[in-house]
Amino acid sequence: MKIDLHNHSYYSDGFLSPSEVVLLAKKEGCDVFSLTDHDTTDGLIEAQQQADKLDLKLIHGVEISAMWSNMTIHILGLGIDINNETLQKGLKQHQEFRQLRAEKMARGLGGAGVFGALEKVKLVAKKGMITRTHFAQMLVQEGVCKDMRSVFKRFLTGKKPGGVGGKWAEYDEVIGWIHAAGGKAVLAHPLRYRMTNTKVRRLLNHLSGADLDGVEVVTGSSSSDEITLVSQWAKEFDLLSSIGSDYHGWPNQRVRIGHLQDMPQVNEMVWKDSSWLN
């Protein structure tokens, strides 16, 4: 059975529509699939309609930014009720911050000689939510930088011209939103943060103490050694294991839906004791 529980559409920083993402998931052989846009569930109704046509099991999801030790992390909410008031109230706060952040980023880029950044990035972001990925893609398309890596290095991190710090809800609050909506809270891509392995272990220890349910053991960019390491951490902190490609669909990105290494069979899966596989 092919399962992919971390993917994006153009309702956040993905390239394709929800329908197109679901259609591609079916084409790539997925049996169970989740759409997990950043801080929004707006694409899930369209995704569900397409999944029903294709007889594909869709798990309603979201990827929520959160603060831990003054650092931004991402927590997936899987199997959520998208009509839950607590969840939607929290997501609205984040959406409002994203708009303010985009305006600040554009002003910073203007000061560095990239003029009209906000107007240009709006043409890249198809559904209103503007993310750092949209700014990065815009700067590549404008020929300011040659690739995404150089954009972030020159413009979008730390004290660079377009670097704007996060002001997200704290991790325990975000976990609470997800649980209020009946979902599983899963730390996304634990090895992608700018942390040493020792610090990631401390992160997992803190989050597991705040009732985190699971951790993403397998991602679309994971090496075998990374999978083994995160699998060990999942067992150490009594966390369920999840799997997801983190597909965005931009032409200059290599990750593909459903093309994932195998999950270690010694781990308990995040879909344990759920109806997700029915």
Language-model-derived ranges and their functions:
Residues 259:
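Acidic, carboxylate-rich catalytic segments that either coordinate divalent cations
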